Structure formats: structure tokens, C-alpha cells
Amino acid sequence: MVLSANDKTNVKTVFTKITGHAEDYGAETLERMFITYPPTKTYFPHFDLHHGSAQIKAHGKKVVGALIEAVNHIDDIAGALSKLSDLHAQKLRVDPVNFKLLGQCFLVVVAIHHPSVLTPEVHASLDKFLCAVGNVLTAKYR
């Protein structure tokens, strides 16, 4: 999915609001995903999945950190997330649909915390970005 210059600007603007909250927003995104889509929990049998869990916070921080990395390399998301793509495709074997579910939950978290920023246009840009990230993370499944 091709991001326009306007999309890139919108995404970068949203992430200026998110960067300082990586752990909290990431944990909230994961908790929301696990509750809304219970089958996603199967990839985390060793995690304490309760609200406020240190494991959820740590992994949430990694998730948002990867998104921040993608934003920082928005013109080469595939290069920025290549190792992460390998990990998810070859070692973890995460069902590709889960990236879409995670993206949806992340959008909800952004909307909750920054409703004035998430205009319809920005929402569309962020959705395109999250789809692009998902496409990169699933590219090596083929």
C-alpha cells in the first residue's frame, strides 16, 4: 500500500503524541486485542494476561516501538521491519490476520487518547500505515 506525502505527514503527527506512551498504549492495545479476539492469546501461553501485567506492558512497549521504528523509516518500512518479519513468519508463525486485529485495536487506543487528532483523514492515513506494516510483517510468509 502506497502512502501519500499527506499520509506520511498525518502518521508522523499522530506518532508525536504516541512516542512518550509506548508502554501504556502498547499494553492497552494488547489487552484490548486479547479480550476482543480471545484466540490471539494462544501465542502468549507463558504470559500473565491480566490487566497491568509486567509481561503485557513489556511486550506492548516492543509492539509500539516497532511501529515507531516503521514511522522513523516510513519510506522503507520493509527494511526497517525485516528482522521482525522474519521472526514472526519463520519462528513464531503468527497467523497473519492477527496483525490486522492488532492494528484495529491500536486505532481504538489512539482514538480514545487523542480524539481530536484522529480526524477521518488522519484515521484513513493511520489505517493505511498499519496495513502497510501488516503487509511487511506477512510478506515473508509466502
Swiss-Prot record:
The entry's keywords: Heme, Iron, Metal-binding, Oxygen transport, Transport
Positions of heme b binding: 88
GO biological process: hydrogen peroxide catabolic process
Classification via PANTHER family: HEMOGLOBIN FAMILY MEMBER, HEMOGLOBIN SUBUNIT ALPHA
SUPFAM superfamilies assigned to the protein according to its UniProt record, in alphabetical order: Globin-like (SSF46458)
Any one GO cellular component localisation term in the record: hemoglobin complex
Single GO MF descriptor: oxygen carrier activity
Organism: Aegypius monachus
Functional description taken from the UniProt entry: Involved in oxygen transport from the lung to the various peripheral tissues.
Residue positions binding O2: 59
Protein family (similarity comment): Belongs to the globin family.
Superkingdom of the source species: Eukaryota
Protein name per the record: Hemoglobin subunit alpha-A
